[in-house]
Amino acid sequence: TERYNASYIMTDLNIGPKLNLVTGVRLEVNKTKYTSYHGMQTTLPHFNSMGSDTVFSYERDNRYSLPSLFVKYDVTDWLSLRFAGTKTLTRPDYADIIPLYNISGGSGTVTYRNPFLEPGVSQNRDYVTTFYDNRLGLLSFSYFTKEIKDLIYSSGRRYITDPSLYGLPWYTEKNMIIDYKTNNPYKVLLSGFEIDYQTRFWYLPNLLRGLVFNANYTRTESEVKYPRTVIEQEIIFDPSFQVITSNVDSFYVDRLLDQPKDIINLSLGYDYKGFSGRLSMMYISCLLYTSDAADDRDS
């Protein structure tokens, strides 16, 4: 089950003929009770130990206040300055937070979902300068920043030294979680700029006056500290032979997952009476799809 409640208060103020302020706050409460299975597989795939396939429920209660501020100042009839400050959430997927685990007794691995994941919280700032002219059209220059806390990502394999940290039974100690998703303890920093141009060639003769052109370019820079776990084994011979396995935690710096550095949008269109058509093109530079830890190259 899931209960989602939200309320907000907002005000829209005009201060003189040139300045407009829109501000408010949104309060959100998200309560969930998800049910899933706890299972154990033995070395014989057709046999599970008694009581191993049990149904378990976990309740979550997330509460957030999300303020926002939007400012617009018309310097002249052709120049406008804007600012936006917002706080937003990225909620974890349902499949990532159900209270599910499945223990493979033969391989010593655990398929695990993390019900303790928290939503990612982003503080956003946007600064926009807009120029407008009847012939030029609309030209905008934007600069934006994001500061993301508790980014959700896959940290790869995890050696279990203390099962209670994951809500697992005691006998999973020294087993291995196959793919451990967690909240990044380091803040993510993202910034960039955007240039947007929109125009209509109404002043051209005859049929050419129906032409429409749009162009947009976005450049983004990001820096993320990705925690990485290297599983190391130490062999000790004296006074007795033993193998000690441990998690060695570190981090590496890279850009944000699924965030391209460059995005270009071009659109050429034509409007005539009831007809409207567009020919569009989008270019997206290379993406970072998975973290090094998720690839498990260093584990």
Where are these regions (language model features)?
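Solvent-exposed loop segments that connect transmembrane elements
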Residues: 33-58, 97-113, 157-179, 227-252, ...
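Outer-membrane beta-barrel signature, preferentially recognizing the C-terminal barrel domain
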Residues: 2-3, 60-61, 89-148, 166-201, ...
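Signature of Gram-negative outer-membrane beta-barrel scaffolds
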Residues: 1-76, 102-103
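Membrane-embedded beta-strands that build the outer-membrane beta-barrel scaffold
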Residues: 7-13, 19-27, 67-75, 79-87, ...
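Single conserved hydrophobic/aromatic residue that forms the stacking wall/gate
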Residues: 289-299
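Proline-centered helix-kink/hinge sites
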Residues: 67, 92, 260, 293-294
